[in-house]
């Protein structure tokens, strides 16, 4: 149960994402973190694949852009479409500077703090005295990490986009693993409900 809680607490809401989008007057470095952060929320990739994105992986689409990723963990190629005007504009000019995983994780928390994402939230933090993760109540921005981006992507699209399509993008091979990842349990009617939405006869 503790592991499931850890998954659930790190998600960002749509309202919180809009607050991040609306941030201004950030330093150049912090705004670069914000851009990578918002891109991660729109493409659902692991941080190692996200931060290795290069201009040659970007292609024009009829209604946005295609991003071609090679997922290192699964050894699979995947193309993700993006159409958010802000993200498309940044990608078209490739307004992203290289950044390390460690610096990115620190920057995410700072961006979230600037956006006022500070609701006291149950989660895990490293206790420096014991060197173990400790469950407690913390301002939500302290709990945001690069893992939060992919999980938020999956959670916000779940129930709106067919689950196999989300799994293809995030790189999950088993539905049970995917559902655990976003803190859901398998609903025996989910497949039937999804099918009914697509029926046209």
Feature locations, PLM:
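Short amphipathic helical patch at the helix-1/turn junction of helix-turn-helix
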Residues: 40-42, 157-158, 182
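Alpha-helix N-cap/helix-start motif at helix boundaries, enriched for small hydrophobics
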Residues: 36, 48-53, 166
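C-terminal catalytic core of Y-nucleophile DNA break-rejoin enzymes
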Residues: 6-7, 72-131
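DNA/chromatin major-groove-contacting recognition/catalytic segments
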Residues: 8-11, 78-85, 168, 180-201
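Short, polar N-cap/turn motifs at the start of nucleic acid-interacting alpha helices
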Residues: 57-62, 159-181
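Basic, Lys/Arg- and aromatic-enriched nucleic-acid-binding interface segment
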Residues: 1-47
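Conserved tyrosine-mediated DNA breakage-rejoining catalytic core shared by Y-recombinases
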Residues: 16, 43, 52-89
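Short, basic (Lys/Arg/His-rich) helix/loop patches that form interaction surfaces
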Residues: 25-27, 109-168
